[in-house]
């Protein structure tokens, strides 16, 4: 569990938890997220068990979750992540073809599925788009 780019003054920005067992992929995702104003990496996890613990502790806006991880896969961790961080939006980013696993991932509670190899722009736009969509859905309820 390595924390990166934690800045409590950035409460207005979108906090992102990066979960991937490959250190080089986590580093790449940290760079991708960090390149955009309004996004920051709140933390990192290297397996499903760490992902659950960090989701509980950090309560991020968005979790980027790999499927193939040791100790507990992303798919196994997903229901517990949604339980401990119910407001978090989950983007599964995996090397598996979308045609093979996307339906299962979305049925398990993920909000979006992207294949690894997606462009940095698509990854950032997916994260921001999810949060904007969620904000629009919640705003009428808050006005009450």
Question: For the regions a protein language model found, what residue spans apply to each?
Answer:
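Active-site beta3 strand of CheY-like receiver
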Residues: 58-64
């Amino acid at each position: 569990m390595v924390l990166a780019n934690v800045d409590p003054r950035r409460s207005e920005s979108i906090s992102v938890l990066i979960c991937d067992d490959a250190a080089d992929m986590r580093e790449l995702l940290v760079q991708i997220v960090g390149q955009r104003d309004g996004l920051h990496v709140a933390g990192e996890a290297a397996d499903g068990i760490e992902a659950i613990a960090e989701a509980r502790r950090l309560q991020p806006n968005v979790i980027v979750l790999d499927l193939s991880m040791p100790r507990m896969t992303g798919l196994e961790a997903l229901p517990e992540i949604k339980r401990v961080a119910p407001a978090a939006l989950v983007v599964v980013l995996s090397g598996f073809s979308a045609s093979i696993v996307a339906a299962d991932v979305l049925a398990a509670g993920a909000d979006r599925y992207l294949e690894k190899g997606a462009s940095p722009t698509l990854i950032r736009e997916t994260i921001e788009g999810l949060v904007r969509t969620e904000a629009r859905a919640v705003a009428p309820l808050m006005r009450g």
